[in-house]
Amino acid sequence: MNKQVIEVLNKQVADWSVLFTKLHNFHWYVKGPQFFTLHEKFEELYTESATHIDEIAERILAIGGKPVATMKEYLEISSIQEAAYGETAEGMVEAIMKDYEMMLVELKKGMEIAQNSDDEMTSDLLLGIYTELEKHAWMLRAFLNQ
């Protein structure tokens, strides 16, 4: 068991768990002309988040670690900030885009740590998530005309 790899993975579990809640918040509270589009998109993204949480937590268990599993732990180690009430639809999209861009940096570092630890399976798991996030970040930037 490599403690650095476990830390990287637990940070991802925490990030995805906070993001899961944030995406639900946005799914429920989005308003305006893009309601139907964003309501559906946020649901797609939180469903994907749930898959990542499970895959990463199971990887932690497979390599002998213990995944974080409480809201307290998530909030202590996550880089993701909870959603603020009163966000505009565009503000919601921008917040998620920024979260994804930050997570891309963390995933890249995590892949490097896993590779340096000869843990190709973890690196591959993180690469798959990275690829999905990179596409989502691009689409969110396009939505915002950035």
Swiss-Prot record:
Q: Does the keyword Oxidoreductase apply?
A: yes
Q: Which residues cross the membrane?
A: none
Gene3D superfamilies, alphabetically? 1.20.1260.10
Residue positions binding Fe cation 1: 27, 54, 58
Q: Which residues bind Fe cation 2?
A: 58
PROSITE patterns associated with the record:
DPS_1, DPS_2
GO cellular component term, pick one: cytoplasm
- An MF annotation (GO) of this entry: ferric iron binding
Q: Which reaction does it catalyse?
A: 2 Fe(2+) + H2O2 + 2 H(+) = 2 Fe(3+) + 2 H2O
Checking Pfam families in the record gives: Ferritin
Q: Output the superkingdom of the source species.
A: Bacteria
Q: Where in the cell is it found?
A: Cytoplasm
- What processes does the entry annotate via GO biological process terms? intracellular iron ion homeostasis
- Intrachain disulfide bonds: none
Q: Does the record's keyword annotation contain Membrane?
A: no
EC number in record:
1.16.-.-
Q: Which UniProt keywords apply?
A: Cytoplasm, Iron, Iron storage, Metal-binding, Oxidoreductase
Q: What does this protein do?
A: Protects DNA from oxidative damage by sequestering intracellular Fe(2+) ion and storing it in the form of Fe(3+) oxyhydroxide mineral. One hydrogen peroxide oxidizes two Fe(2+) ions, which prevents hydroxyl radical production by the Fenton reaction. It is capable of binding and sequestering Fe(2+) ion. Does not bind DNA.
Give the family, as the similarity comment puts it. Belongs to the Dps family.
**What does UniProt say about this protein's domains?**
12 di-nuclear ferroxidase centers are located at the interfaces between subunits related by 2-fold symmetry axes.
- Spell out the subunit comment: The 12 subunits form a hollow sphere into which the mineral iron core of up to 500 Fe(3+) can be deposited. Homododecamer.
Q: What is this protein called?
A: DNA protection during starvation protein 2
